[in-house]
Amino acid sequence: MTPRIEESKARKLIGVSCHMSILNNRTAELWSGFRPRVSEIFHRVSPDFISLQNYPEDYFRHFDPKKSFEKWAAVEVLEVSNIPKGMQFFELPAGKYAVFEYKGTSSDPRIFQYIYNEWLPTSRYRLDHRPHFEVLGEKYKNNDPNSEEQIWVPILDY
């Protein structure tokens, strides 16, 4: 699987966040609280959802499944106004990304093993310390094997 390389503009997101780890995965809880309220958000760029991970700087240097990171359930907006109660604004910085078109269940770790253990070490890129995110469009079906999503990995040239 070869990604496309894309320069992304800065994006304005509105959503909810929590801290979790791989072992203490609270993704379902996060999304179950967010999805019913998404109609409260105005000026959406598209109907897509953004699942974002904001990792500490040393997260990938010393991987530990108990290490905490910030997870977001969000949507992109054109302008930030009237943020619904209990939600927050997040500015996703501009930068270069490797974008993987993934088809499969959201719980299958093999795609991430491929990206970080096979593709990245043999590419001409290195991981950048910016948020990682997934774009969940109309073909996203969570744990359905026919589900489709885009996985955006922040990169820098060597």
Mark where each language-model region is.
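A solvent-exposed interaction/effector surface
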Residues: 1-158
